């Protein structure tokens, strides 16, 4: 019994759910149908009829009449056929939805959408075309009078200033006639109701008059350039060229007379372009001619600056070469003198020869350049380039010569410094011997004495090299450095030994107070004294220090610090 009840409840619940779903779908279908009905009403409300009435106010002939008939037919078809079909489809869709025939309702709605879409698009096209026609009429009416004023003013200006246009006047008159014909065609198109065609004519007038206005403004200026400004500048250029040649300038390389003839021909082609109203081509040619003319003027100016440079720099270079020549002769003599006393390296001798050779080359080049200037067969700009190069090489040669001269002076300076160094080393040895005598040492270790002897011999060898003629400073400096290292080492080692010996004496003196109390100590101190007398100061220090440290730890450090303070004070 319970199971049957459960089944009944499930079945009833399912039926209710299905019913609710169908009700929801139906409500949604109703909403879609209502939206389509609203769209249909919006289409009906579009002001096609009102716009068509506006067209009737125009000249109903020609193009306007033809378009009006087409739009009327389209509108009648939409109202009589397409929209009723859509309305019938929507009624069917509502009926099917109420009967829960949703598939049929959907199909009917799609048919309605198709018809409404077609109607909407066709109406939009009609309205756009209507608007284009009406706007064309309105714009034409608003703009044509302004264009007539522009044309009249242009015509008056050309007639009043026809002398400013020269041979181009005829072409301008022809173009004005072309624009005048457009006004006639505009009136005809408007009278025939061809408003769209009239619109095209208005736009053509705007473009044509704008172009013509630009030409009318540019032609006078271009004619002035071609007939007055540029010819005068070309004549001035030619006169300037001839005047400069009389003043001694060499200008054949510029070929200015030929350039002037070529540019004069170009001016004639520009005049032809202006006559034919090829304004862009004429303007480009004139700009090219101006650039070409400026370049030629710049080249003449370059020659003027070059001549001034040559006149100023020639004197400077001449003086520089004379100075270098005199200094080179002095340096050559100084080199011969130095070679008698010093041994020069091959590279140093070669440097002097190179300087002398370069000097002769520069003097020869300068001499040839002066001849060319006197013969007046070369442009000053070319002379300037050659003179600049000679001047730069003179400056370089000055530097090389100064360096070579400094090298010669340095050799003498090196000899003087070497002798000073030897005297310094001699003083170091004397000071070392004085310290030994003052310290009352019994003598120095054999190794130091041998090193001292070696240092003295090295110094003697340097003295010997300094007496040789020619003097080889490279060898002198090398052996001098070696001798100084030996003597300096001997001096430092001797000072260390003296300090070490003094410390040994102090340690032995300190240990003597314990000598009678400790036989081992006495023996060690005696041994230290023996080593001291045999100049074995390292061994003596080690012997005395070790025995005292055993007896009194730290005493050696204290005595060493005392000795250091005593020697530095």
Curated annotation (Swiss-Prot):
| Gene Ontology biological process terms, A to Z | division septum assembly; septin ring assembly
UniProt keyword list: Cell cycle, Cell division, Cell membrane, Coiled coil, Membrane, Septation, Transmembrane, Transmembrane helix
- Write one Pfam family the protein is assigned to: EzrA
Provide the protein's localization. Cell membrane
Transmembrane intervals: 7-25
Give residue spans on the Cytoplasmic membrane side: 26-569
Coiled coil location: 103-149, 273-336, 383-440
Q: Which residues lie on this side of the membrane: Extracellular?
A: 1-6
Report the superkingdom from the record.
Bacteria
Query: An example Gene Ontology cellular component term from the record?
Result: septin ring
Q: Which InterPro entries match?
A: EzrA
Family indicated by similarity: Belongs to the EzrA family.
Described by its record, this protein's role is as follows:
Negative regulator of FtsZ ring formation; modulates the frequency and position of FtsZ ring formation. Inhibits FtsZ ring formation at polar sites. Interacts either with FtsZ or with one of its binding partners to promote depolymerization.
Q: What is this protein called?
A: Septation ring formation regulator EzrA
Q: Which gene encodes it?
A: ezrA
């Amino acid at each position: 019994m319970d199971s049957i009840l459960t089944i009944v409840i499930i079945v009833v619940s399912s039926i209710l759910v299905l019913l609710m779903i169908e009700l929801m779908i139906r409500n949604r279908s109703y909403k879609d149908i209502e939206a389509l009905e609203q769209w249909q009403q919006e289409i009906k409300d579009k002001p096609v009829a009102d716009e068509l009435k506006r067209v009737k106010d125009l000249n109903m002939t020609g193009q306007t009449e033809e378009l009006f008939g087409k739009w009327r037919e389209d509108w009648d078809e939409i109202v009589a056929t397409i929209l009723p079909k859509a309305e019938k489809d929507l009624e069917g869709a509502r009926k099917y939805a109420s009967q829960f025939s949703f598939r049929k309702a959907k199909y009917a709605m799609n048919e309605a959408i198709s018809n409404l879409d077609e109607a909407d698009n066709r109406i939009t096209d009609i309205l756009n075309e209507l608007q284009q026609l009406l706007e064309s009429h309105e714009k034409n009416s608003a703009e044509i009078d302004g264009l007539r004023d522009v044309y009249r003013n242009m015509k008056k200006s050309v007639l009043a200033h026809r002398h400013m246009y020269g041979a181009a006047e005829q072409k301008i008159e022809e173009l004005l006639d072309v624009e005048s014909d457009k006004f006639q065609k505009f009136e005809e198109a408007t009278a025939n109701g061809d408003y769209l065609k009239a619109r095209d004519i208005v736009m053509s007038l705007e473009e044509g008059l704008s172009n013509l206005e630009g030409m009318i403004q540019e032609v006078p200026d271009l004619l002035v350039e071609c007939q007055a400004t540029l010819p005068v500048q070309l004549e001035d250029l030619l006169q300037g060229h001839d005047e400069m040649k009389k003043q001694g300038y060499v200008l054949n390389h510029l070929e200015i007379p030929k350039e002037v003839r070529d540019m004069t021909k170009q001016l004639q082609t520009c005049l032809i372009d202006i006559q034919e109203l090829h304004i862009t081509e004429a303007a480009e040619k004139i700009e090219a001619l101006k650039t070409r003319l400026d370049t030629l003027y710049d080249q003449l100016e370059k020659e003027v600056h070059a001549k001034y440079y040559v006149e100023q720099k020639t004197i400077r270079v001449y003086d520089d070469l004379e100075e270098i020549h005199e200094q080179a002769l002095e340096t050559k003599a100084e080199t011969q003198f130095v070679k008698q006393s010093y041994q020069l390296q091959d590279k140093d001798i070669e440097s002097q020869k190179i300087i002398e050779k370069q000097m002769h080359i520069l003097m020869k080049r300068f001499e040839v350049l002066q001849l060319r200037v006197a013969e007046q067969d070369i442009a000053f700009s070319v002379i300037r380039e050659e003179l600049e190069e000679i001047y730069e090489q003179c400056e370089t040669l000055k530097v090389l010569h100064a360096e070579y001269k400094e090298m010669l002076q340095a050799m003498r300076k090196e000899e003087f410094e070497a002798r000073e160094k030897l005297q310094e080393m001699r003083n170091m040895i004397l000071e070392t011997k004085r310290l030994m005598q003052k310290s009352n040492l019994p003598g120095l270790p054999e190794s130091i004495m041998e090193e001292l002897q070696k240092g003295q011999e090295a110094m003697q060898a340097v003295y010997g090299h300094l007496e040789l003629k020619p003097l080889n400073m490279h060898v002198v400096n090398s052996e001098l450095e070696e001798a100084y290292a030996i003597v300096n080492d001997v001096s430092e080692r001797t000072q260390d030994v003296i300090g070490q010996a003094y410390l040994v004496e102090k340690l032995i003196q300190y240990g003597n107070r314990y000598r009678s109390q400790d036989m081992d100590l006495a023996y060690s101190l005696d041994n230290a004294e023996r080593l001291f007398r045999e100049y074995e100061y390292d061994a003596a220090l080690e012997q005395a220090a070790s025995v005292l440290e055993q007896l009194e730890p730290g005493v050696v450090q204290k005595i060493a610090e005392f000795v250091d303070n005593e020697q530095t004070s």
